[in-house]
Regions:
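Catalytic cores of the polymerase beta-like nucleotidyltransferase superfamily
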Residues: 1-498
Length: 498
């Protein structure tokens, strides 16, 4: 109880105002406190519950404040009306939830309830109101999410959630296999919470996962994708991904409904072969999977870079890629093959074409970036000119941003080989140089710095003339300046008149 005593010491009977952790620790915020007070005055039990209690116990400021109560939905609506509060029926009859709006914030107030699960892989088939707080806490997924607190700061911890927080351990409420079989999405939530909280999964939790794998086939792609995205942008995404892959969850499939029929969508089976895959020790400290996790951890927590990091070496060890040359393990072509695999994965995940193609470009070009960054004789400007001519990017700024992303990925790739941050200095300088080259390289005629009279000079061959000017600038035959473009336009017009 030592940890909790530090947190609850700032709670007083009549104080519900928010307070910063620097000044007084964390307390129940004003709106939640008012709701708990109103419930108590009406003779009802009321507690903050779930993630907000967990966050308080970890010294964090909760983002959401959920409340559980003995009051039925109609009673909660009556209490809200008596206080002049805005209240929304959030599925009261079925789920017992009323949403109270106070100070511009929404508070979900839910009646104590129990749940029975059936054929649906995620939603309960039957929800009934419970009589006690303990019954309500028993239905929750993990011990750290199954704690409640009253308005006076008293903690209700029936399942050892506080102890698990102190031990940085994620453990299921009761039997892990039963909890996962009830709601298969909890499998992905377990991976996410491990990543978000920097916890270790309890051995009982890991053992309980496999029995629920058949239920994953009934989960929607949308739900799984949401959990995956939240996992990947977590600070400790490597922990969560390691659990996802090593447990076997990555080899399962969810589903999507299209044209009236369900289609199977594999999670991420392509990653499984990387576990334990050896790499040439001269260049790599870790096997292919630990390397991938290290790269993932070394990138900034944004979806684009995290997906690129996760998939950048996905083709290593594949037939036709893995070979032994002169006694060394090699994976020549893994960047190109990996780009194809990344496109397949993100397409089946129904990611946007723009997002998919940028991840694909990063995966496909990460080895090329390493080569150019380490080869002073390589013609970097030629690379930029070719990209501009091939219309790979919509603008010069988009090309510059992509090179900065590629720089960050490749720096993480170096760190993931077990090398220090100082080893990335050359890549940092080269990436910034490539971004600057890109900003000076026009991708479309709109980025040519021509004077206003050039279109009139080129008429009636404006489109052809502009494309000619753009091509010459991209080839390095013409400067992108008003004077040079004006003279070139005059010469083009003269040739077409003659």
């Amino acid at each position: 109880m030592r940890l909790w005593s530090q947190i609850s010491s700032c709670f007083t009977k009549n104080s519900f105002a928010s307070c910063s952790c620097d000044e007084r620790g964390h307390a129940i915020n004003e709106g939640a406190g008012q709701i708990l007070e109103a419930l108590e005055e009406a003779g009802k039990e009321g507690y903050i519950v779930g993630g907000c209690v967990r966050d308080l116990a970890m010294g964090k400021v909760p983002h959401d404040w959920d409340i559980t109560t003995s009051a039925r939905p109609e009673e909660m609506l009556s209490i809200a009306a008596s206080r002049g509060w805005k209240a929304i029926d959030g599925g009261g009859r079925r789920f017992g939830t009323v949403i109270i709006v106070l100070g511009g914030e929404n508070y979900e107030v839910t009646t104590f309830r129990s749940e029975v699960y059936g054929s649906d892989a995620h939603r309960p088939s039957e929800v009934s109101f419970a009589k006690t707080l303990k019954e309500d806490l028993m239905r929750r997924d993990f011990t750290v999410n199954a704690m409640a607190m009253d308005r006076r700061g008293r903690l209700y911890d029936e399942f050892g959630g506080l102890s698990d927080i102190e031990r940085k351990r994620l453990r299921a409420v009761g039997d892990a296999g039963e909890r996962f079989s009830e709601d298969a999405l909890r499998l992905f939530r377990a991976c996410r919470f491990v990543a978000q909280l920097d916890f270790m999964a309890d051995s009982s939790l890991v053992k309980g996962m496999e029995s629920a794998f058949p239920r994953v086939s009934g989960l929607s792609l949308e739900r799984v994708r949401q959990e995956m995205d939240r996992l990947l942008v977590s600070k400790h995404a490597a922990r969560g991904m390691d659990l996802l892959v090593r447990s076997g969850l990555a080899r399962c499939s969810c589903r999507i409904k299209e044209k009236g029929a369900y289609m199977e969508v594999p999670i991420l089976p392509e990653l499984s072969h990387l576990v334990g895959l050896p790499q040439q020790k001269e260049f790599h400290k870790y096997d292919a999977w630990y390397h991938t996790l290290a790269v993932l951890e070394a990138t900034s927590p944004e979806p684009l870079l995290r997906w690129a990091a996760l998939l950048h070496d996905v083709a290593k060890g594949m037939p036709g890629i893995r070979a032994i040359r002169k006694g060394r393990l090699t994976d020549y072509g893994h960047d190109k093959k990996g780009a194809e695999m990344a496109r397949d994965i993100l397409t089946r995940y129904r990611r946007s074409p723009a997002f998919t193609e940028e991840v694909v470009w990063l995966v496909e070009n990460h080895m090329r970036f390493h080569f150019f960054a380490n080869s002073p004789e390589a013609d970097a400007e030629k690379w930029v000119r070719q990209l501009a001519r091939d219309h790979v990017f919509s603008s010069s700024e988009a090309m510059a941003e992509s090179f900065l992303h590629l720089k960050d990925l490749c720096k993480a790739d170096i760190i993931g080989c077990g090398r220090p941050l100082s080893a990335t200095e050359g890549h940092e300088a080269f990436g910034n140089y490539m971004a600057e080259l890109s900003r000076r390289m026009p991708v479309t005629s709109k980025e040519l710095h021509y004077p206003k009279d050039v279109p009139a000079i080129l008429a009636p061959h404006v489109a052809e003339g502009m494309n000619n000017l753009l091509f010459r600038v991209q080839n390095g035959d013409l400067d992108n300046t008003e004077e040079a473009l004006h003279e070139a336009a005059l010469r083009f017009a003269k040739r077409h008149r003659d």
